[in-house]
Amino acid sequence: MSIDNELSKCRNIGIMAHIDAGKTTTTERILFYTGKQNRIGEVHEGAASMDWMEQEKERGITITSAATTCFWNDHRINIIDTPGHVDFTIEVERSLRVLDGAVAVFDGVAGVEPQSETVWRQADKYNVPRICFMNKMDRMGANFYRCVDMVIDRLGATPLVLQLPIGIEKDFVGVVDLLEMRSIIWDEESLGASFHYGEIPGDMIDIAHEYRHKLLESAVELNDDAMNLYFEGKEVPVSLLKNCIRLGVIQSKFVPVLCGSAFKNRGVQPLLDAVVDFLPAPNDVAMIEGIDVKTSNPVSIKSSVNEKFVALAFKVMTDKFVGSLTFIRIYSGKLSSKTTVLNAVKNSTESIGRILLMHANNREDITEAKAGDIVALAGLKKTVTGDTLCALDYPVVLERMEFPDPVMEIAVEPKSTADQEKMGIALSRLVSEDPSLGMCVNPESGQTILKGMGELHLEVIVDRMRREFNVEANIGAPQVAYRETITKSVEIEYIHKKQTGGAGQFAKVNILFEPLPPGSGFQFESKITGGAIPKEYIPGVQNGLEAIRGSGMLAGFPVIDFKATLFDGAFHEVDSSPLAFELAAKGAFRDMVNKAGAILLEPIMKVEIVTPDEYMGDVIGDVNSRRGRVAEMQDRNNTKVILAFIPLAKMFGYVKDLRSMSQGRAQYSMYFSCYEQVPDNILASEIKK
């Protein structure tokens, strides 16, 4: 077998979903049926091999993405099991960036939940082909057909149903295979390892033919031969039909839908077949785009072992046995241990020591990795998440990842002098691992401020600091990470002039400040022509604006969603310098504050609340009291689903209040939606602080 033919038998996939939809349970069954492990690890028992952190075992949730490799039907499947909790969405983001395909797991009762929408959009962003697995079909209230409708309505996707469930809720025993038009029934005694094929149940023949017709209509459009056979009324061979589906999945025309119950050991083997049959190999996806460092020209990187080595570092973590581990996805070429590669972002070299295949937190040393592989490198010194590693004679940079801004912060103080130094080391290490985690020191109080994606995120970080680094710390109450922005365009001319005994300082800048749409961040542009300001001084202007916008205008919060355009200025042959222009930019920013309509922004959370009917009035009243607005209400079995938008500042401790008003029967989930202007009374209190 040629090496690139071997590449066609590789699948890099992620398992993604809302929390508690059954991602890790599904992954554990995959590992059992592929022979990767000889027992099934259950999440609720804290025994899932993919949830290896102590915090994951205790909470029964996935916190960090875990990688593993297994084999099925002569194909190698590299799997990344990702978290479903919104606080750890960064793990999903960086995993999807390096994957070729994904399995989206849905709760057969709840269907498409808020975090399902989030991860789906993340997969859309990176054009990741997907398969849907409707899980928990054995649960009371499970409804396969409603879940399929929700995929259309909430995700805007085109589902291609390949299976139908046989039996409802506790009577769910197997599936109808619409490709082969047969039933598949699982044997309970073998933990689902054994199953048998049979006839389609008589009461399902009509609906099976209906969905088979829909399947054929969608799939045959991808192949002329298949279309001709279909319109001539002839049977389309299963192999040709599978090729049509594969092409449609790779082109994101539709999303195959399968069903089962991972916990009851039903439906996992056909899911593995679908991964092999329909999700792309590394050499099926479009060529990766990069930038040639020397020429700044775009380059296309072909996924082949015979090309130059190019890889993306997508995760850095600390292992107590081997130190720093850098996870990479190799897009082209080969990598051997005891060689040297280039970090094209840092323009520095890295020596490759150990190359490791990972199974959760277990390691296997290998001497070589090649295109398509996902491996970990031990002991890299300078590489961080998003950096490109490449051959020394092929300096290219791949597109960097974008990470969300933290929305919550806490003050962290060491309990003793001995903890002081250890805390600095611990936090530096944790921040380097997690791009969604931020740290700074309050210049007035001297307190260390830790910024994260939510209460659980920060709670886990503090817990890791204590367990892994033996640091005891006092933790302040969570605070909202507000932002500031401008609402008007304004032109500012500012002259910085200072004369001391020796050389003076002189810089003149003319800057246009403009508001940008939400989510745009900060943008800087120079329109200097004719040498009004020498090129070497312009970065000083940008640096000055970057530095001062972090200190805010109203209440000391970072300023976002605005553009600064440097369109004119002046310099002095002797007295001008990059520092002078940096100070001039800061002065222009300060002058702009009172003229550009500065406002304070607060994070708004999209909240989904599931409550029994009898508590709906209390729940809605409580939402309104939190400055929230109800956007939508739906019926789901015997419960009401309320979709609301509520300021994060009003969500602290909400879980306790919700349990209290519903006698513990209601539940909720939330994720960041957008920033909105805060009411004047909140603005006044924040300015006082």
From Swiss-Prot:
Gene Ontology CC terms, in alphabetical order = cytoplasm
User: Where located?
Assistant: Cytoplasm
**GO BP, one example?**
ribosome disassembly
What does the UniProt keyword field contain?
A: Cytoplasm, Elongation factor, GTP-binding, Nucleotide-binding, Protein biosynthesis
Pfam family name, one:
EF-G_D2
The organism's superkingdom is given as Bacteria
The name this protein carries in UniProt is Elongation factor G
Organism per entry: Ehrlichia ruminantium (strain Gardel)
The gene name reads fusA
